[in-house]
Amino acid sequence: MTIILHRSDFFEAILNHEGSSVAVVENESGASFCYSSLLNSVARAKEQLLAKTGKCDTSVSGERIAFLVESGYEYVVTLLTILACNAIAVPLAPSFPAPELRYIINNSEALALISSAKYVSKAEEVLAEGLDNTPLFCQLDGTRNISAIEEEVKLRDFSDEPRGGMMLFTSGTTARPKGVVLSQTNLTAQAKCLLEAWKYAPSDRLLHVLPLHHIHGTVNALLTPLLAGSSIEFMYPFNVNSVWTRLAAPFLENEQINGHSEKTNGAQKDETRVPISFFTAVPTIWSRMLKAHDSLSHDMQAAGKIAVSPNNLRLNISGSAALPKPIRDGWIQLTGGNVLLERYGMTEVGMALSCGLENTDRVDGSVGWPLPSVEARLMETDDETEIQRIIEHGAEIDAHSGKERIGEIQLRGPTVFTGYWRNPEATAKEFTTDGWFKTGDIAIRRQVPESGLGKSGSWAKGPAYFIQGRRSADIIKTGGEKVSALEVEREILALPEVDECAVVGLPSEAWGQKVAAVIVLSSKVGGSMSLQSLRSALKTRITAYKIPQDLEIVEFLPRNAMGKINKKELVKSVFGEVEKIRRRSIDLQTKRPVLNGQRG
């Protein structure tokens, strides 16, 4: 029997990959699944989904289908099944409370909610109340069962226009999250630009420790490796000791791997001991990896170092938040020269900018260059007149002041999303009249010696981009000067007493805004830190007006699943509401002396 699936770049690639190559490995169970089985599983699941929803190929086209499935083969099959139906996949985070999941289901107007066996009770809780229209509830049976006789798969073009894709929800700070609609064309373009820049290959084994309701986990670590024929090994949620054990496993004897040999047998055991060549994560994960290495056994430390050396870990990527220099430098030292590659992206556009594969193109503090097919520009806004000007290449330095010009990153190209779901006003607000997406992120462009020469590809040429922060949260206007919170954070994090840091702008009677730091002290170094000692430590590192004028020490900094800090909420929780901050500002002016001629 022949199975027919709609043609797409993803399905065409999967069909053409070596059938015996491993597509997915589930680390916990040791189960592995080959590329030859994947489309068969998708075809069977598609038949079930259409039958359970009472739809056909044409009537399901463009419908939103939510799913609550754990990381692993079943997730991959479910996502591809929805794409095969020409529908829009809406991945749900199992960690979210029921009210948040109900909001996403309501907002997306989901036709159906698919659940794995693991999350049936969670799905039933979500469906029990509070929904405008209750979606059909269904399970796709047997997605993990591999048929002994694999049927021939053929692809055909869509009978109607492609309307499928994925809907991811942005994390709202002042409003409820918005549904970002990414068409299959967007997803394909996003995956292809990464494939060209980062050179995914069938020989790659990618360790997947990320949540799958964010762009990082779905496009960078799932769809792109599938397009390339790489192997994806799921190991979520992240556990630092488990990850070090997995990385070290290929370089240890069986008896040295605590309990690992008991979980697997035969060929499957071998799959969980294939060296990891590709690991993409967020800065908090890299920080925890560095800290945990010292606590490993001597044998595990030695094997771990071999595992993450440039000879074995081909590519280590950091993103979704700024990478502190101490983490970057610490990883280079631990690995014997493996430089973390930084990149920049967001839900609406996938990845947009990236450093290159060549070490000279992995520039400290930079997110590199526009990826293949991505157009990027910087738009400068005059604070007084609100007049906007494009910062042309070669004009990065202001001719009058001699300072670097800063502007908003704006993007255009096939990777950019089609719009916010059922929200034309918000969509129109985020695009310029000439069709560029306004990211809200502020950056400078700078030519860096020995980099941007095209060694990593023709796309990685010229001046590199350096993110200064979010326009709304990370650009602090104090006494007529603009301060990048990210720049100040990098310098504070270079101090040995500091473990974590967030720099924010607070209302100030004297300066409009003042720079403030919220710090977690290092448990290794110990001791304390006062505002005066912080300012003294920074006065030789950054200009006086950038040095924090306020300081709070906290036990921890709250972060979301991707390691990001909501600075608006942080200011409220640490410093209080605006009027309280203003009173604090007045009080501090009367109590605090000016240090060494700097503003207090």
UniProtKB/Swiss-Prot annotation:
GO MF: ATP binding; medium-chain fatty acid-CoA ligase activity
Region feature (SBD1): 241-342
KW Transcription (keyword) present: no
Keywords: ATP-binding, Ligase, Nucleotide-binding
Record keyword rRNA processing present: no
Superkingdom of the organism of origin: Eukaryota
Short name of any one Pfam family annotated for the protein: AMP-binding_C
Residues annotated for substrate binding in this entry: 346
Protein induction: Expression is induced in response to 2-benzoxasolinone (BOA) exposure.
Binding-site residues, ATP: 170-174, 214, 321-323, 342-343, 347, 441, 471, 564
GO biological process: fatty acid metabolic process
SUPFAM superfamilies xref list: Acetyl-CoA synthetase-like
Region (SBD2) residue spans: 343-420
CDD domains: MCS
Residues bound to oxalate: 564
Enzyme class: ligase
Signal peptide: none
EC number, UniProt record: 6.2.1.-
Domain free text: Both substrate-binding domains (SBD1 and SBD2) are involved in the substrate recognition, and are sufficient to confer the substrate specificity.
Function noted in UniProt: CoA ligase; part of the Fusarium detoxification of benzoxazolinone cluster 2 (FDB2) involved in the degradation of benzoxazolinones produced by the host plant. Maize, wheat, and rye produce the 2 benzoxazinone phytoanticipins 2,4-dihy-droxy-7-methoxy-1,4-benzoxazin-3-one (DIMBOA) and 2,4-dihydroxy-1,4-benzoxazin-3-one (DIBOA) that, due to their inherent instability once released, spontaneously degrade to the more stable corresponding benzoxazolinones, 6-methoxy-2-benzoxazolinone (MBOA) and 2-benzoxazolinone (BOA), respectively.
Family: Belongs to the ATP-dependent AMP-binding enzyme family.
Protein name as annotated: CoA ligase FVEG_12633
